[in-house]
């Protein structure tokens, strides 16, 4: 009942990814989604799934999803026109009377999408690794996929296909060549991770950490931990839970899980440990990876001390899959970092931009400042920081705390973007940062225009903030000719 309520109440944005699924019969689909066949050939087959008529291909099954800004039922006719062989709807009136396509009625097309993905996933004998956490999910997913890809054919979700729409669409890409699936799982409320895990059926569950991202929606860090911990509740008895030994909720989660726990951290007692962590040339880090009596040196291809912990989480997940340390090392050293995360790009004007604009939370802001501090060979270090969203009542203090943390790192100039980010400036000034070295702007366009004229050869500029404030616009302007 709780899961059903979640599906009905969730606000979604309609997204789509092209699929290469194996064909499904109409009978299979109707039974999997507990639907009613309204019309069409019951003996026909469908060869793909779509939620967007703009990318729909002939033979697809179109799900009419209702989101915050669009109702897929308005596009049912168009879907059939461009070749949909079937449609899944909750409104019978949305199906044109003259349509030859298969029409299936359900209570909730979003829920039905997940149910069909669950059924489709059950047709394959694959191992699934599920990854969640407040920060580090995407990078950890890419690291896990890089490691496991050395031994198996791996399917992973791409872009932002990590929610109740994107994860099912990713599963429809499964085919007989795949041996392992690596899935990032995002959430904005209780019940969502449980739902995603129930669909994907992971045997390895990774929780990178528990922070205060989305605390506006969940109310407390304890509720966030509960939401992340739903992943463990869906693991099988012989499953493996990968947990951060240095996280404040580690003991609670470890004690609640009855299967095998593989812990990671830089502390003694963890199962997978990073020792002798050191900053290498260019701001990248190296460390000794320890597991029981084995040790191996790892040199990270990505900037940031925090990525050592993402690497540990990925290594622990690989250990749970039976992978040896040499393969883990090779996977970590050769993975490709996700876009807009710790990308250091030199401009034609001679200054560098540290692009970390994908998103922002208090923990990731401080991690980015630490990364900026570790960069050597630059004359002036500048932090351009935007709003952090979904922090609720914690927002004022969280932003001020980032400003306070600025004093622990060698930043010469602070630029804030957005009304909330002005609190970062307040925190910095209160901690002793020079008011003359602070600039505040209302939006990213204004900040970009002003900042570019102030940069000189030898500067390095960190740009970071929540996606809604469009910090990528600043990066675009700074790197333009």
Model-identified regions with their sequence ranges:
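Mobile, glycine- and charge-enriched loop segments
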Residues: 53-64, 172-181, 369-392
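Phosphate-binding loop of NTP-binding sites
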Residues: 28-31, 96, 111-245, 249-257, ...
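ATP-dependent carboxylate/acyl-activation modules
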Residues: 131, 339-343, 460, 468-476
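A short acidic, helix-capping loop that chelates divalent metal ions and anchors anionic groups
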Residues: 212-218, 354, 388-392, 463
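Short, basic phosphate-binding NTP loop
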Residues: 2, 16-130, 139-150, 172, ...
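Acidic, Mg2+-coordinating active-site environments of NTP-dependent enzymes
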Residues: 30-32, 90-99, 206-352, 379, ...
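Active-site beta-alpha connecting loops in nucleotide-dependent enzymes
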Residues: 69, 338, 357-436
